[in-house]
From Swiss-Prot:
Catalyzes the addition and repair of the essential 3'-terminal CCA sequence in tRNAs without using a nucleic acid template. Adds these three nucleotides in the order of C, C, and A to the tRNA nucleotide-73, using CTP and ATP as substrates and producing inorganic pyrophosphate. tRNA 3'-terminal CCA addition is required both for tRNA processing and repair. Also involved in tRNA surveillance by mediating tandem CCA addition to generate a CCACCA at the 3' terminus of unstable tRNAs. While stable tRNAs receive only 3'-terminal CCA, unstable tRNAs are marked with CCACCA and rapidly degraded. Comprises two domains: an N-terminal domain containing the nucleotidyltransferase activity and a C-terminal HD domain associated with both phosphodiesterase and phosphatase activities. Its cofactor is Mg(2+); Ni(2+). Keywords: ATP-binding, Hydrolase, Magnesium, Metal-binding, Multifunctional enzyme, Nickel, Nucleotide-binding, Nucleotidyltransferase, RNA repair, RNA-binding, Transferase, tRNA processing. This is Multifunctional CCA protein.
């Protein structure tokens, strides 16, 4: 019975990155032997155990054989005669197929350390194409390690393209697609995830709303990058610079989907694309079962981002109506979120990356002004019922009007 550290812990250690979770593989042991040593079994489909003290996961070495469609169609075989090399062979990428024993020695039968040095994401074997989820996982790793200059091996990208064209991605559940997307949105370069999906054809399958933006032009004066799909990923990259919140990143990515609905005869103008895109974002979020908080912000950003770009020209009545519409009184964080998504949109353009975005500060300051209006004073003045809301609105508009006079 031998125990090895495997997977991400070994990979990240070799990259001198922080090691968060440790996974172990046990060779030459049976489930009963693990139980006798105090381990707690938690795996149903294959034997995975929790260490009695560290509670880290220890999995018995196993092989996997394709027995059905999709990412769940596998039959696992786990027994004391399964070797470490056989267990590592079932893993997705060579950089994830490195093991380390208690003495610090590496078992690296598939060249993972060499690929780490070459900054290469390469599949272990042809069995890679048996699990369609791996297309998304590789895209996520590309996003996670883009800042270290990792790239996908040509042969791996070709395999991902073949997997997409085979229709296997249609067997992925919405929950798994969203989980990988959610993790990708947390990476330093989330735009790389979606670019890789486009490169292998998967974007059209999983995110057609985004894929449909490619080839849709915008006015060169305002969008030197011209292509709306390119702009969407540039805006996402800027959102990642401005905020760690995936709510902001997600909302920024899909803010322009309504432009795909513009008739070609009206190109490159896209008047009204914000409200037009709201049903598309709603359908996307329902299909992928996106959490409500992310969905709600994305819907608001899609509808109102153009209004925020012209916020300094808007009358006080429009500003108060905007704060009402986004429910800022109960969810004040939305003001900052909408300011940041709009800034990411504005700066996510070729040549605009380092420009200031005064509209964001204007929106925040306007919010500070309306917040200074006291609800208690309105109630104390004798207003009741709906009259309280009406008087609050009147006073907020008056406060903004006075503020705008001195701008």
């Amino acid at each position: 019975m031998k125990t090895y550290l495997v997977g991400g812990a070994v990979r990240d250690g070799l990259l001198n990155l922080p090691v968060k979770d440790k996974d172990w593989v046990v060779v030459g042991a049976s489930p009963q032997q693990m139980l006798d040593r105090g381990y707690q079994q938690v795996g149903r489909d294959f034997p995975v155990f929790l260490h009695p003290e560290s509670h880290e996961e220890y999995a018995l070495a196993r092989t996997e054989r394709k027995s059905g469609r999709g990412y769940t169609g596998f039959t696992c075989y786990s027994a004391p005669d399964v070797t470490l090399e056989q267990d590592l062979a079932r893993r997705d990428l060579t950089i994830n197929a490195i093991a380390q024993d208690a003495g610090g020695n590496y078992c690296d039968p598939y060249g993972g350390r060499a690929d780490l040095q070459q900054r290469l994401l390469r599949h272990v074997s042809g069995a890679f194409n048996e699990d369609p989820l791996r297309v998304l996982r590789v895209a996520r790793f590309a996003a996670r390690f883009a800042h270290l200059n990792f790239r996908i091996a040509d042969e791996t990208l070709l395999l991902m393209q073949a997997m997409t064209h085979s229709g296997e991605l249609h067997h992925l559940t919405p929950e798994r697609v969203w989980k990988e997307t959610e993790l990708a949105l947390q990476t330093p370069s989330p735009q790389v995830f979606f670019q890789v999906l486009r490169d292998c054809g998967a974007l059209a399958v999983l995110f057609p709303e985004l894929d449909n933006l490619y080839g849709v032009p915008a006015p060169a004066k305002w969008h030197p990058e011209i292509d709306t799909g390119v702009h969407a990923l540039m805006a996402l990259a800027m959102a990642a610079r401005l905020s760690q919140e995936i709510d902001i990143r997600f909302a920024t990515l899909f803010h322009d989907v309504g432009k795909a609905l513009t008739p070609k005869v009206k190109w490159p103008s896209h008047h009204g694309h914000g409200p037009a895109g709201v049903p598309l974002v709603a359908a996307l979020c329902e299909r992928l079962r996106v959490p409500n908080a992310l969905r709600d912000l994305a819907l608001l950003v899609t509808e109102f981002h153009d209004l925020v770009h012209t916020i300094q020209c808007q009358p006080p009545t429009e500003l108060v109506a905007l704060f009402d519409r986004v429910d800022a009184w109960r969810k004040p964080q939305r003001v900052q979120q909408i300011a940041l998504t709009s800034e990411a949109d504005a700066r996510g353009r070729t040549g605009f990356e380092n420009n200031p975005y005064p509209q964001g500060d204007y929106l925040r300051e306007a919010w500070r002004v309306v917040q200074s209006v006291s609800t208690k004073e309105v109630v104390d003045a004798g207003f009741k019922g709906m009259a309280v809301r009406e008087e609050l609105t009147r006073r907020r508009i008056a406060a903004l009007d006075a503020w705008k006079q001195v701008q």
